[in-house]
Every structure is written in C-alpha cells, then in structure tokens.
Swiss-Prot record:
Expressed by the venom gland. The lineage of its organism: Eukaryota, Metazoa, Ecdysozoa, Arthropoda, Myriapoda. Pfam families: CBM_14. The keyword Disulfide bond applies. It comes from Cormocephalus westwoodi (Westwood's green centipede). This is U-scoloptoxin(01)-Cw1a. GO terms for molecular function: chitin binding; toxin activity.
Amino acid sequence: MSKATNFYLFVLLGVFVALVRTEDEKPPNLTRVPSGLSFSCDGKKPGYYADQQMECQVYHVCTPDNEHAVLLCGPGTIFNQKHLVCDFPSNYACADAAKDADDANAHAFEVKVSPTPVP
C-alpha cells in the first residue's frame, strides 16, 4: 500500500472511533419527565434515587413524609448517585447507582443542630 492509502485509512479509522465513542457517551436528552415511570418509594429510605431505566437522567426524591417527587437532569447530564447532583456522564457510571444509593442517602434529610455557644 502507498503512504497516501495508509494515511487515508488511518484518518477514516480515527473518524470511526471518534463517532462510536461520542455515541456511547451521550445520555438521553429528555426535555420533560416521561409518563409511566415504574419507580416507587415503597420500602426505600428517604433520599435521592437515580432512575437507571431512564439512564439516570431522571431521579426521584423520597421524603420522610412518604412524598415522592420526580426530577430531571438537564440535557447532556445524568444524576450522580454518589454526590447527589446532576453531572456529566464521563464523571459517573449510571450502572453504579443502585450500589451507591445507601451510602449516598445515609444522611439525607438529616437536620444538624449546632449547640448554642456559651458566653
């Protein structure tokens, strides 16, 4: 093969790898919370829970009063279960959400009261 042919093959391979990698890293880009979600707070401790069925772009809040709220991360982001924030997919693996939930929610809704200083 000539140097020119090798060069073109190398460029095409690079473009292919870049396209495949970009496609793998894209989260869903929802603009509203979808209907028909199956998540339930029943049996869960109060806290924040990534919805893995929605690729972590949707997350749920289960309150101590047994209320349930559904929230959506912005386009291009997913819910980082470890830090309880919306984050870039390159910073968190949605597949880890279930195992990270208990530790992340251990102190959710906990109110810390500072002692009154004594003069």
